[in-house]
């Protein structure tokens, strides 16, 4: 496995714990207008798009009546399989930054997305909200220079002022517009 594959696997495991622990998929999430199900479907659909890009097939999405836990589990395994196959991991897909190899997109975008949505799903469903501290630090330092770009509609909302003495996780979440 590569460093990115390992990091992805660790973060996906954390998200998986929240998916497996979710009992109310209709719970309101911190993402405006989204339920817990919407958060899990968003992450799953992102994975499905990358898998389709690696395989040269048309992307599928999670159906409204589909078991989101099963869809997530399958999509996670499929993306992990892509990441451990050097030729598939090197396949180019479209990203917010332009064309990018899948492995690079996972490292730059998907890992951050999974990390943040782990918290969103945990908050929505009353589960453990603690995030991987090393991933929090890396994500925060990676996103700070992209502040203007990530404020575009549909990415992240306006920053929230963190409380005095906030830990790194709280600072990251507030930077991304989450109310902690």
Regions picked out by a protein language model, each given a short descriptive name:
Residues 37, 41-44, 48:
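An amphipathic alpha-helix adjacent to DNA-recognition modules
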